[in-house]
C-alpha cells in the first residue's frame, strides 16, 4: 500500500519531466562518440516522436545536471518539450582545428542517424537549436543537410572573417584570439 506523505509542489503534475540517458554513436571520421538523449517519462519505443537537437561542444559532462524548468535566453526549456512529447538529443562534438563547421557535421548528423535507426524518431519533425557557438554550427549545418524541418541559430557569427578584427565583448580583446586559438578553432590567420 502506498501512502502519500505530502502534496508539496502540486504544479509538478502538469509536467512529463523526462528521463535522460547516455547514447553511443560513431562520427563520420570513425570516432566513438556519446550524446545525451532526453525522453518523456512515458516514452514508448514503438511510437514516433518529434526530436529537437541541441548542442554546444560537450554535453555528456552534464548527464547528472538538473535542468530547472524555466525559460532560458540561449537554450531550450527541456521540461517544456518533454512534456509535449519531444525527445531531445545533445550530441558531443569533437573538433578538428581548421574545420569547425565540418567537425560539427561529422559528429551531429551520424548521431541523429543512429537515433533514427532505432525507430522512434519522426523523421519529418526534427528541429535543431543552438546559440552563439552552437548558432554558428547550426548556420553551417543547414547549408549541408535537409534533415531539419526547423532550425534556430541564435546569435551566430556566420562570417568569422568579417568579425575577425572586432572586439570581444567584456574583454577589450580582438576576436582573433578566439577565432584562431580557442573555441572557434580556425587554426590560423585567415
Regions found by a protein language model. Give the residues of each.
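Non-catalytic accessory segments flanking enzyme active sites
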Residues: 1-47, 71, 76
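Flexible, glycine-rich phosphate/dinucleotide-binding loops
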Residues: 2, 11, 44, 61, ...
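Extracytoplasmic/periplasmic beta-strand context in beta-sandwich domains
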Residues: 3, 49-51, 124
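Active-site donor-binding loop signature of nucleotide-sugar glycosyltransferases
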Residues: 7, 27, 57, 93, ...
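Short, surface-exposed "cap/lid" segments of acyl-processing enzymes
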Residues: 43-48, 52-72
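Active-site-proximal cap/loop segments of hydrolase catalytic domains
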Residues: 54, 67-190
Amino acid at each position: 500500500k502506498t501512502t502519500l506523505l505530502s502534496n508539496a509542489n502540486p504544479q509538478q503534475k502538469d509536467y512529463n519531466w523526462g528521463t535522460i540517458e547516455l547514447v553511443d554513436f560513431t562520427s563520420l571520421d570513425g570516432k566513438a562518440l556519446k550524446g545525451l538523449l532526453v525522453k518523456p517519462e512515458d516514452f514508448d519505443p514503438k511510437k514516433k516522436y518529434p526530436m529537437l537537437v541541441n548542442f554546444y561542444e560537450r554535453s555528456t559532462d552534464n548527464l547528472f545536471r538538473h535542468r530547472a524548468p524555466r525559460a532560458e535566453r540561449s537554450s531550450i526549456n527541456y521540461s517544456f518539450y518533454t512534456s509535449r512529447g519531444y525527445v531531445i538529443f545533445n550530441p558531443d562534438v569533437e573538433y578538428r582545428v581548421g574545420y569547425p563547421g565540418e567537425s560539427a557535421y561529422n559528429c551531429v548528423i551520424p548521431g541523429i542517424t543512429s537515433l533514427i535507426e532505432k525507430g522512434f524518431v519522426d523523421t519529418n519533425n526534427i528541429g535543431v537549436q543552438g546559440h552563439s557557438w552552437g548558432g554558428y554550427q547550426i548556420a553551417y549545418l543547414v547549408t549541408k543537410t535537409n534533415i531539419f524541418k526547423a532550425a534556430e541559430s541564435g546569435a551566430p557569427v556566420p562570417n568569422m572573417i568579417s568579425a575577425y578584427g572586432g572586439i570581444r565583448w567584456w574583454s577589450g580583446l580582438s576576436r582573433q584570439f578566439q577565432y584562431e586559438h580557442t573555441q572557434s578553432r580556425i587554426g590560423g590567420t585567415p
